[in-house]
Amino acid sequence: LRAFFFSPHTWCIMAPSNDAAKDGQMNATTTCGIPRLKNIEQVSEGWINKYILTYELPDGTDYVYESTSRKKLEAYRAGLMANARGEAPRVDAVCIVGETREGTLLMIREFRYPLNSWCVAFPAGLKEPNESIRECVDRELREETGYRLRSDVDEPVRLLPQAGFSSTGLTDEAIQIVFAQVEKAGDAQPEENELIAPFQLPLSDVRRFLDENTTLIGTRAQLILEVFAARAER
């Protein structure tokens, strides 16, 4: 029996000692170390790039792992090294939790090609290289929904303290969740291949929506909506 536990920079294996195993006790010996990234091989290139990562585990054995990223090889390598140093991740995209003055959440149904289906989500999009978070939020709102940041609020955006990773078993994509006060600005202007239907969800209806929705839904949307539902039920 072996157990694994982690700190930000340490990887540990905990195994029962021989004497403990004889006695049926859980006294254990612990070996700690850090997996070492030995090699990154790019095996396909495109909008999504695929990589083979070779690690040396603390016990000296090699471990090969497949991953994907929108970043090209050198940018991907630099990002992995920055992660290992404990640096804050560079924001790749934003997820916008927009609330209107009418007490509704701004949501979308978007056709997601990897799913071959419509999916419920919050408005979101990739950040341009020289774009601020606020600029990205306002642009994505206008493009996907026809909404904008409210002009009558001094600070219409609130960022979570750090960007979070969208799917840590697959990719390095880091997403900044932004809570925003939004208002209608005009017509949406999505790209030709973007099929997006914005809708407003009253805060009082969030629990019923979660219980009754049958359209596919993103995990972020599920979790955030659950928080709003629980808050409304207090």
Residue spans for each PLM region:
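Short Gly/Pro-enriched turn/cap motifs at secondary-structure boundaries
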Residues: 41-44, 85-88, 168-169
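Aromatic (phenylalanine/tyrosine) cluster motif
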Residues: 4-6
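Alpha-helical and coiled-coil interaction segments, frequently adjacent to or embedded
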Residues: 19, 24-51, 56-61, 72, ...
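Conserved Nudix-box catalytic region and its N-terminal flanking loop in Nudix hydrolases
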Residues: 83-139
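Acidic, metal-coordinating catalytic segment for phosphate/diphosphate chemistry
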Residues: 47-95, 101
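Nudix hydrolase/Nudix homology domain
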Residues: 15, 19-21, 27-34, 39, ...
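Active-site segment of metal-dependent pyrophosphate-handling enzymes
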Residues: 90-92, 99-102, 112-114, 142, ...
